[in-house]
Amino acid sequence: MKQPFCTPTQALRRVLDAAAALPVPATERVPLDDACGRIAARDLCARMDQPPFDRSPLDGYALHSADTAGAGEETPVTLPVVMKLYAGDAPAAALPAGCAARIMTGAPLPPGADCVLMQELTDSGEEQVRIYAQLQPNANVVFRGEDIAAGAPIAAAGTVLTPAHIGVLAGQGIPDAEVFRPLTVGVLATGSELLEAGKAWAPGKIYDANGIQNAARLRQLGFAVERTHCSDDPEEIAARMKDLLTRCDAVITSGGVSVGQKDYLPTVLEMLHAEPVFAGVAQKPGSPMIAAQVGEKLVFCLSGNPFAAAATLEQYAVPALLRAAGRREEDCIPVHTRGRLTTGFSKPSKGTRFLRARALGGLVEIPGEGNAEAHSSGSLSAMMGCNCLVELPAGSGPVAPGEEVEVLNFVQ
């Protein structure tokens, strides 16, 4: 499994390429009520013009604009009201010249009418109406297809469907959408020291936080998750991974990837005849991470240090899994922006370093008020409230408040 450490850019490219080469996920058709957050499996286009007819955007009177010539507060034009139209009505006849139609918001314009006058510029008459303003053709008309025309794209295949997509689809009379079935990810935490939350604590033991945190993040992104843990035994780890790979589309492990006497994951991957994608990334934290492929399934082996696991999950595992799940590549990658620090970081960075941070409105806060100890890869609590990583290039010195930095925003 040994390979030279790759750069973060190389590591991301390799896992995305590996994910894109996997078989396309199965699809299913779901009602729109259940489609939000799912990934469109094919291009979705408008079936009809929206709105499907010329309509009024306000309460007032539909008119022939020519009939309003010369109308003003001192020189009103009086017209007979020959019909009344509400939203949901279909005009029974065309509007004759020299007549008005009482019309409500959302109602279709009768044939012949070419403008709508708001009722505030009239006397609101029922049988006849006094017009106090002159209108141009097409005034206050929402035209057929103005929102979206028949055949126009709504969502490309690979798009995560949002409430706005759902609303537009429903407005087309489309009751459901073809989406990719969610991938199932096996999450395996390794370590003889681990206890499941709720068990009685014992000296030398710690509760498994990595496994459940990784699982929670994956569920947040729409994956189904099967979670378990096992002791530091290569045979047991291999058996658990084999079992997960029979039922899951990918596996993520935490712990056991470094060079300690009980870091067995490299050996286990060899036992499983895994093909390496990369083994090690030139960054801190998370440098020992391994990405591999067993058959047509991806395996990501993360550090057991909580922040290292969380950072590399976001940087490499999440983008690759989203790509494998059917998302468009551009929607799988953490978005890079620039931000100005409100707090600093007091330590130089010999190699590429990533810090947990919170970005809002172009400002970036690094937790711990510049205290490097708060950014230990073993610290879990400092992740709370963070929504991004700050990248400090190799050879960087300490950074101070007010400096501009590169920000990797977590994928949503």
Language model features: what each stretch is:
Residues 9, 28-33, 42, 88, ...:
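Flexible glycine/proline-rich
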Residues 1-73, 327-354:
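Short, low-complexity N-terminal leaders and the immediately following helix N-cap/first helix
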Residues 35-49, 90-102, 149, 291-292, ...:
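Short, hydrophobic/aliphatic alpha-helical segments
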Residues 27-32, 53-79, 112-127, 327, ...:
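Short beta-strand/loop turn elements enriched in aromatics
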Residues 2-3, 8, 62-228, 373-374, ...:
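Short, glycine/charged-enriched hinge/interface segments at domain edges or termini
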Residues 15, 60, 151, 187, ...:
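Residue-level signal for inorganic ion chemistry
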Residues 1-9, 175-302, 306-312:
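Helix-rich terminal scaffold detector
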